[in-house]
Each structure stands twice: as C-alpha cells, then as structure tokens.
Amino acid sequence: MTKVGLRIDVDTFRGTREGVPRLLEILSKHNIQASIFFSVGPDNMGRHLWRLVKPQFLWKMLRSNAASLYGWDILLAGTAWPGKEIGHANADIIREAAKHHEVGLHAWDHHAWQARSGNWDRQTMIDDIARGLRTLEEIIGQPVTCSAAAGWRADQQVIEAKEAFHLRYNSDCRGAMPFRPLLESGNPGTAQIPVTLPTWDEVIGRDVKAEDFNGWLLNRILRDKGTPVYTIHAEVEGCAYQHNFVDLLKRAAQEGVTFCPLSELLSETLPLGQVVRGNIAGREGWLGCQQIAGSR
C-alpha cells in the first residue's frame, strides 16, 4: 500500500465556485480526504498575462492549452476591472469543504504573492499572511492550522514570517520528504511537507501527452523513494479535467495507492533542512526547494 498526500490548491473565484464543489463530490464518492488550500482575497490572476513576454511562461501556456484549460474568465480576471473577492462570496462552499477535509490558507491575493512576495520585507509578508488567515478563520469559524505558499514562492524570509502564526505545518516548497526548516536562530521551525510530484501543467505537452498522464503519474508515485505528495488545482482537475481525475483515483485504487490529508504524513521526528530558491522543469521563475541540512 502506497500512501500519497493529496493537496488541492484553489487559486481563483471560478475554481472556488465551480471546481471545489465538484471535487468535494468526487472525493466523497471515493471516500478520500485531502488538504484544501484556499485563496480568499481578490482574484487578480489575469494579471499574470504580462508574463507572456517570458518565453518559458509563454511555452507553458501554449503546450497546456491554457485558454481551454482555465477559461478566459480566469485568464482575464483582475485585468480591466478589480478582481472579485473570493472568500466571503463563496463562504458556504469553503465551510462545506472544512466539514470534511483539512483546510488551510493558500494566499490572500494569489497573484500578489506569486509576483511580488519575493521582494517584500518581513512585516509586509506577515501582514499579508495575517489578513488571509483572519479571513479564512472568519469563514470557517475555527483556527487555521496549515498553509501552502502560492506558486511555491517561498524562501527563508517566508519561513521566518510564518513562525509568527504557530501553524501545525506548512507546504511551501518542492522536495522529497517532510522536514523542519532551520530558523535564523538555529532552532527548528514549523514542519514543512513538500510537494514531491509534478503538476498537470508542468508536464503536459513536454514530458507526456494528456491521455497518458495518469499512467505516467502512477508510475512516478510507485517509484517515489520519499513521501509522495501530489497537488491538483480546483481550476484544472475540478473543471476541464475532472474526468481525468476520477480515472486517476480509480486506477490508483487498483494499484494499491491511497490518498490522505497532508497532516497524516507528519511524524514526531523529522530531518532538518532549509527552503532555498531553485527552479524545476516546466515551471517559470523561482520557487522554494527543499535542501537537507548539510547538503549543497
């Protein structure tokens, strides 16, 4: 039996309004619990369009057929008009998710975090996280115990900023296994649960065809030497590719693969490490990567 942490990122208004209810229904039918990370502030994701001038981002958008994958409402959100606030407008959906799944903060403003947080000072970052946590807690009526940085934009500054909130764990980086990042003080920080597996949009049209993706991914899961964690997006697997996701769950069950919330992957003793800026194939720009203590 192979246990895989299932993380669901919700980036947009449409992903929350349309994708999350579909995913909740799918997961209920398959008796699966997951960790769902919500963006709760303005939906400004369309402002990423300026990144089309960067060849790597343009190629990603073309090979993944982004217009069909996400829809033009997502691709243009917050461009010619202010982005709609996601959280309170979809409070009932978020509360329903929290009844059955582990719910955490993805971002206040997903676009702002992904585009600008790398240049924020620590207090600006703390204020932004606090705003998101406060909003999500108002919606679900209970403390939020976990978070996942938007776009995996995380480094030592993010690690230090999140210590102020005493969360149970964060999932801010890519890596191989859960660990505790070393703080500037030399003490271990809040547990990190890295994503170990590639997302749909990182590999489609580059490493694998859409129709072959599920078999390809299951092979990666079964060969994973660490603690496998897989991320799906409400805007993808909850919308245009929900049938592919259902097929993945059926095939996974046949292979003895089970999915669980990320918190179930935590253990009392974790290795020490750091979150450093790095790059991975299929994703434009830097992102947080796990570095085990003592490695280079």
From Swiss-Prot:
Alphabetical list of PROSITE patterns matching this protein: NODB (PS51677)
Annotated organism of origin: Escherichia coli (strain 55989 / EAEC)
Function: Catalyzes the deformylation of 4-deoxy-4-formamido-L-arabinose-phosphoundecaprenol to 4-amino-4-deoxy-L-arabinose-phosphoundecaprenol. The modified arabinose is attached to lipid A and is required for resistance to polymyxin and cationic antimicrobial peptides.
A single GO cellular-component term on record: membrane
SUPFAM superfamilies for this protein: Glycoside hydrolase/deacetylase (SSF88713)
Pathway(s) it belongs to: Glycolipid biosynthesis; 4-amino-4-deoxy-alpha-L-arabinose undecaprenyl phosphate biosynthesis; 4-amino-4-deoxy-alpha-L-arabinose undecaprenyl phosphate from UDP-4-deoxy-4-formamido-beta-L-arabinose and undecaprenyl phosphate: step 2/2; Bacterial outer membrane biogenesis; lipopolysaccharide biosynthesis
Coiled coil feature spans: none
Protein name: Probable 4-deoxy-4-formamido-L-arabinose-phosphoundecaprenol deformylase ArnD
InterPro entries in the cross-refs: ArnD (IPR023557), Glyco_hydro/deAcase_b/a-brl (IPR011330), NODB_dom (IPR002509), Polysacc_deacetylase_ArnD (IPR050248)
Signal peptide as annotated in the record: none
GO molecular function: hydrolase activity, acting on carbon-nitrogen (but not peptide) bonds, in linear amides
The protein's enzyme class: hydrolase
Catalytic activity: 4-deoxy-4-formamido-alpha-L-arabinopyranosyl di-trans,octa-cis-undecaprenyl phosphate + H2O = 4-amino-4-deoxy-alpha-L-arabinopyranosyl di-trans,octa-cis-undecaprenyl phosphate + formate
NCBIfam families found in the cross-reference section: PRK15394.1
E.C. number: 3.5.1.n3
CDD domains, alphabetized: CE4_ArnD
Short name of one Pfam family: Polysacc_deac_1
Disulfide links within the chain: none
UniProt keyword Lipid metabolism present: yes
Keyword list, A-Z: Antibiotic resistance, Hydrolase, Lipid A biosynthesis, Lipid biosynthesis, Lipid metabolism, Lipopolysaccharide biosynthesis
PANTHER family xref list: 4-DEOXY-4-FORMAMIDO-L-ARABINOSE-PHOSPHOUNDECAPRENOL DEFORMYLASE ARND-RELATED (PTHR10587:SF137), GLYCOSYL TRANSFERASE-RELATED (PTHR10587)
BP-aspect Gene Ontology terms: 4-amino-4-deoxy-alpha-L-arabinopyranosyl undecaprenyl phosphate biosynthetic process; lipid A biosynthetic process; lipopolysaccharide biosynthetic process; response to antibiotic
